[in-house]
């Protein structure tokens, strides 16, 4: 159910603004994709090699077709990167970011073998929640919208029609009593707070009402003259400075799960009927413990809903609140899009299997809760979409991947290729070498690269082999580090930066060297045990690993193997095919491959930035993703943390901890998770220091 008839969406053109123009394979890929979409093809695959500019191609495609677009990514990090790229390419359009708003999430679960019940525990990121509301607000009010989302967009989001029905439309000159408007705000789950003015609250001063919508950072001022809306202004909530005057505004509810008193009463009646039936079933089967457990929990939840309109875990009653039939699919972000939206699935070889697996992973946990009396059977309908339900809700789809999976290849009538890089870089040369003497050969290759100030990645099959190889190379004087699953996210980022800057020359890892590493300084990728068939040595994994050497003019891949497996043959054949095409293109046009120049500070430069200037926010209207969060100087930049703290008084240390804690929350709110993680670690170290100082003075 898409509420497309209830609102008139504003129409603005999609427009790419960039210093670059399509080059390499991009013009042909854009033309083919556009033609096939306009011809009505439902599934199209863009086979784009690493570094060919698939994101830019997607932006130019959106500009060509002029349709609202959902871009799905396999994880939050990649979604954030894509959102930033699209915001740079489409600065005048609404580029939104929609991912799970949990910083931390422990779902409710029950382990029968140990009779252990685990309560739901979570920490919600307010800024991500704002961005989710901003996405639905944009989708319902304008057409020039690109939403970059993780797979969480197929989870229940509340009924879009109820969301629209509860919306308030404000227009200069309209007639409405002030108190009626305030009651509508309360019904939309906004809270009156005349002292602390923040997102999701409103305040009243005579004939002036001010409110901060949950999806905005700026406030809205509504000025009355009697019962007439005299003026509407957008203003800065802190300074009160007016940003612009408005003629008309849509104000949406403070929650996607909005329900009026009548709907809630109907829901409670349905819950009570279901509870009675389920209790009779459990007691009839002699399961008195489960029946008592369910009775206590559900009657408590019902009482909470009657008294305050909500309860812990209210999403488990969403079927009753939405008025859906048993087994029917939930409403999701997809229902907020217009009918003609386009879907782009990035890294489709990863994302498509994720979409298909979400339902079963969720239902197996809930099934246990229902079976043992922790939840009513209707809780099973608080779930993500099944695969077939997902397919029913999407239209034309473009799959992006360097290694498309079997599903998308089977759905598409041939692929659109994009293998020529704008920089002229070609895929690396692949050399297959015997395993006998492989370590000595690898050592010689490493030394040769180190002399040329180039870097090396080595991928192994097991943790023990990685550790042993790292120890061996260290003994031989090689500057080497080991990247493994126990290294936290921030340290992983630092290791990659140190590799690029030349702090060390070799990075050894297992499965951490596939997607997502952009390392132009790496000229050699060594794959040990390349002939051991399996997940880590599949054709897809090998092609992705080979791509790590595709950013360097002299990139090479050495596969150590005693035989050529089908997966190796596939990866070698595909890489050579791309390489031949790239070399021929360069030769024909006289192009010399250019080294990829990427600033090394890209990943960690946030560690040295200062506080946000409030005037920037006012001038820019609202902060874009990627704005600067206040962070401390990077540890080590002017001495270690311990040196900086030498001689500090206990009070000073406590003040510093509080300051860093505030900065950590701001960084998390700005989605700078690596920065927040670093601050968290520094705070932990400081607290240990404070405890030691307190103990010494006691």
Swiss-Prot record:
Keywords: ATP-binding, Cytoplasm, DNA damage, DNA excision, DNA repair, Excision nuclease, Helicase, Hydrolase, Nucleotide-binding, SOS response. One of its GO terms (biological process) is nucleotide-excision repair. GO terms for molecular function: ATP binding; ATP hydrolysis activity; DNA binding; excinuclease ABC activity; helicase activity. Residues 654-689 form the UVR domain. A motif (Beta-hairpin) lies at residues 101-124. ATP binds at residues 48-55. Pfam families: Helicase_C (PF00271), ResIII (PF04851), UVR (PF02151), UvrB (PF12344), UvrB_inter (PF17757). It is found in: Cytoplasm. SMART domains: DEXDc (SM00487), HELICc (SM00490). InterPro entries: Helicase/UvrB_N, Helicase_ATP-bd, Helicase_C-like, P-loop_NTPase, UVR_dom, UVR_dom_sf, UvrB, UvrB_inter. Residues 438-604 form the Helicase C-terminal domain. NCBIfam families: PRK05298.1, uvrb. Belongs to the UvrB family. Forms a heterotetramer with UvrA during the search for lesions. Interacts with UvrC in an incision complex. This is UvrABC system protein B. It comes from Beutenbergia cavernae (strain ATCC BAA-8 / DSM 12333 / CCUG 43141 / JCM 11478 / NBRC 16432 / NCIMB 13614 / HKI 0122). The lineage of its organism: Bacteria, Bacillati, Actinomycetota, Actinomycetes, Micrococcales.
């Amino acid at each position: 159910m898409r509420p497309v008839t209830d609102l008139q969406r504003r129409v603005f053109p999609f427009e790419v603004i960039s210093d670059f123009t399509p080059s390499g394979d991009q013009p042909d890929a854009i033309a083919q994709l556009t033609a096939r979409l306009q011809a009505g093809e439902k599934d199209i695959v863009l086979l784009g090699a690493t570094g060919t500019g698939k994101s830019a191609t997607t932006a130019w495609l959106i500009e060509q077709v002029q349709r609202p677009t959902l871009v799905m990514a396999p994880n939050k990090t990649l979604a954030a990167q894509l959102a930033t790229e699209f915001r740079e390419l489409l600065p005048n359009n609404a580029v939104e970011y929609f991912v799970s708003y949990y910083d931390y999430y422990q779902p409710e679960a029950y382990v029968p073998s140990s009779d252990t019940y685990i309560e739901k525990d979570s920490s919600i990121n307010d800024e991500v929640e704002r961005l989710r509301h901003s996405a639905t607000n944009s989708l319902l009010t304008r057409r020039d919208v690109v939403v970059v989302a993780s797979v969480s967009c197929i989870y229940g989001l509340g009924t879009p029609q109820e969301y629209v029905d509860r919306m308030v439309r404000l227009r200069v000159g309209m007639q409405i009593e002030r108190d009626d408007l305030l009651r509508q705000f309360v019904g939309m789950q906004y809270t009156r707070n005349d002292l602390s003015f923040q997102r999701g609250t409103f305040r009243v001063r005579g004939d002036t009402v001010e409110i901060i919508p949950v999806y905005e950072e700026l406030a809205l001022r509504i000025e009355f003259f009697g019962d007439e809306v005299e003026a509407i202004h957008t203003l800065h909530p802190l300074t009160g400075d007016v940003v612009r005057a408005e003629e008309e505004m849509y104000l949406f509810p403070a929650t996607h799960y909005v329900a009026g008193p009548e709907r809630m009463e109907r829901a409670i009646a349905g819950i009570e009927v279901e509870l009675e039936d389920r209790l009779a079933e459990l007691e009839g089967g002699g399961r008195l413990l489960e029946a008592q457990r369910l009775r206590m929990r559900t009657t408590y939840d019902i009482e909470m809903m009657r008294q305050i309109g909500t309860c812990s875990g209210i999403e488990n009653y969403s079927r009753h609140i939405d008025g859906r039939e048993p087994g029917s699919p939930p409403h999701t972000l997809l229902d907020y899009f217009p009918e003609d939206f386009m879907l782009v699935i990035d890294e489709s070889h990863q994302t498509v299997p994720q979409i298909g697996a979400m339902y079963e992973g969720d239902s197996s946990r809930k099934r246990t809760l229902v079976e043992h009396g922790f939840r009513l059977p209707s809780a099973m309908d608080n779930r993500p979409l099944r695969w077939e339900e997902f397919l029913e809700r999407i239209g034309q789809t473009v799959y992006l991947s360097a290694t498309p999976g079997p599903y998308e290849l089977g759905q598409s009538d041939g692929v659109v290729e994009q293998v020529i890089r704008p920089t002229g870089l070609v895929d690396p040369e692949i050399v297959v070498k015997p395993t006998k003497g492989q370590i000595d050969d690898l050592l010689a290759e490493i030394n040769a690269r180190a002399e040329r100030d180039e870097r090396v990645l080595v991928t192994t099959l097991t943790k023990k082999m990685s550790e042993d190889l790292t120890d061996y190379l260290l003994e031989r004087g090689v500057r080497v580090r080991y990247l493994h699953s126990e290294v936290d996210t921030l340290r992983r980022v630092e290791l990659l930066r140190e590799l690029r800057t030349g702090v060390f020359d070799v990075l050894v890892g297992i499965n951490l060297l596939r997607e997502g590493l952009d390392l132009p300084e790496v000229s050699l990728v060594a794959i040990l045990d390349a002939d051991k068939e399996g997940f880590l040595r599949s054709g897809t994994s090998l092609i992705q690993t080979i791509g790590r050497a595709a950013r360097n003019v002299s990139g090479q891949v050495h596969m150590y193997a005693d035989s050529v497996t089908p997966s190796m043959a596939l990866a070698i054949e595909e890489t050579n095919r791309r390489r031949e095409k790239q070399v021929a293109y360069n030769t024909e046009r006289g192009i010399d491959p250019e080294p990829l120049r990427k600033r090394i500070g890209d990943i960690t430069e946030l560690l040295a930035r200062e506080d946000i200037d409030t005037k920037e926010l006012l001038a820019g209207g609202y902060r874009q993703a990627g704005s600067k969060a206040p962070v401390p100087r990077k540890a080590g930049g002017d001495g270690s943390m311990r040196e900086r703290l030498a001689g500090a008084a206990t009070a000073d240390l406590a003040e510093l901890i509080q300051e860093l804690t505030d900065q950590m929350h701001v960084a998390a709110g700005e989605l700078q998770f690596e920065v927040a993680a670093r601050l968290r670690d520094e705070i932990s170290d400081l607290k240990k220091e404070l405890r030691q100082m307190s103990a010494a003075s006691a």
